[in-house]
Amino acid sequence: MTIAKMIDHTALKPDTTKEQILTLTKEAREYGFASVCVNPTWVKLSAEQLSGAESVVCTVIGFPLGANTPEVKAFEVKNAIENGAKEVDMVINIGALKDKDDELVERDIRAVVDAAKGKALVKVIIETCLLTDEEKVRACEIAVKAGTDFVKTSTGFSTGGATAEDIALMRKTVGPNIGVKASGGVRTKEDVEKMIEAGATRIGASAGVAIVSGEKPAKPDNY
């Protein structure tokens, strides 16, 4: 598998414009990225632009705080699927995890998994920068129990992004059959190679073109 086919080509900033989405989808077609990862408002346009392409549309749920109710997250998933999303990256209820309310954390994830079942792949963002190692392990275990397809490090909108150490811990926790996505601060081919070596099977990056072409990103970006 090429590096491009492991990358979710990402544009999640609040000021993202239509022109930027059109560029993102054009690049996805050109380079063969796994997906474009966009905010829900851009799912329909992205799906139209990628009609017939190998790249699919990924969107974010409960993003970036994870503090919506399970019911709202489930509705977001259904709406995104109606608009053409094939993958959804949800943020867990981080406060509930820290409160050790594992039942709520699981119910929250399961609401998304159930809404997406048979229609979209689910990635669960645990926001590693806000968690202890014990909490990272627990979050991954709950996500697997709830039926996720992937666990994912970060939103790119908090205090830190992906590290090889966190990827290795997540991979060890979920085993070989669940995907692990590294996101947040992955900007170069070298960054990607470190993440893959640690166990990542998907990369979230806004610098996808720079990564596959070996160029430096135009400017630093958290995502």
UniProtKB/Swiss-Prot annotation:
SUPFAM superfamilies documented for this protein: Aldolase
Supply one GO BP term. Answer: deoxyribonucleotide catabolic process
Q: Which reaction does it catalyse?
A: 2-deoxy-D-ribose 5-phosphate = D-glyceraldehyde 3-phosphate + acetaldehyde
Q: Where in the cell is it found?
A: Cytoplasm
Enzyme Commission number, as recorded: 4.1.2.4
| Pathway assignment | Carbohydrate degradation; 2-deoxy-D-ribose 1-phosphate degradation; D-glyceraldehyde 3-phosphate and acetaldehyde from 2-deoxy-alpha-D-ribose 1-phosphate: step 2/2
State one molecular function term (GO).
Answer: deoxyribose-phosphate aldolase activity
Q: Which residues form the active site?
A: 89 (proton donor/acceptor), 152 (schiff-base intermediate with acetaldehyde), 181 (proton donor/acceptor)
Chief place of localization: cytoplasm
| Assigned keywords, A-Z | Cytoplasm, Lyase, Schiff base
**Cellular component GO terms held in the UniProt record:** cytoplasm
Against InterPro entries, the record matches this protein to: Aldolase_TIM (IPR013785), DeoC (IPR011343), DeoC/FbaB/LacD_aldolase (IPR002915), DeoC_typeI (IPR028581)
Q: What class of enzyme is it?
A: lyase
Described function: Catalyzes a reversible aldol reaction between acetaldehyde and D-glyceraldehyde 3-phosphate to generate 2-deoxy-D-ribose 5-phosphate.
Which NCBIfam families does its entry note?
A: deoC
* Family membership: Belongs to the DeoC/FbaB aldolase family. DeoC type 1 subfamily.
Q: HAMAP family recorded for this chain?
A: DeoC_type1
Q: What is this protein called?
A: Deoxyribose-phosphate aldolase
